[in-house]
Amino acid sequence: MDDEYLALLDRAYKLVSPKAQRRAEIPKIEVVNMPRKTIIQNFGAIAKRLNRDVYLMAKFFQKELAVPGTVEGDVFTLHGEKSPKVVEAVYERFIKYYVVCPVCNSIDTELRREGRIFVLHCLACGASTPVRPL
């Protein structure tokens, strides 16, 4: 019976483990400074991975950094020179407030708008939490 249990346990780990690891990864942000511009090269890929609208994320970055910006494909250009550390701090704040579930700490969430209120709905535990409007 122990051998059968261990075989089933190994099979379960093989089926669940890769997907669980992929879901828990938060992508790194790639920031490049140019004269009078700051470019985030993998912005579209990050938005897709976090299940967020690119323009919603861009709006957050523009408000937090107080500079205008444009989205072109996967690239987000901020029209102002900002330190990569500052941009990474804003990215971490976005993840904290608009991506991570406060109940179970999962990033498997979606941001819904219900009337004038934004609600963070967790797909892992089912919790719904109101968040600050953008």
Curated annotation (Swiss-Prot):
Gene3D superfamilies: 3.30.30.170. It holds the Pfam family eIF-5_eIF-2B. SUPFAM superfamilies: Translation initiation factor 2 beta, aIF2beta, N-terminal domain, Zinc-binding domain of translation initiation factor 2 beta. GO terms for molecular function: translation initiation factor activity. Keywords: Initiation factor, Protein biosynthesis. eIF-2 functions in the early steps of protein synthesis by forming a ternary complex with GTP and initiator tRNA. Belongs to the eIF-2-beta/eIF-5 family. NCBIfam families: PRK03988.1. Heterotrimer composed of an alpha, a beta and a gamma chain. HAMAP family: eIF_2_beta (MF_00232). This is Translation initiation factor 2 subunit beta. It comes from Pyrobaculum calidifontis (strain DSM 21063 / JCM 11548 / VA1). The gene is eif2b.
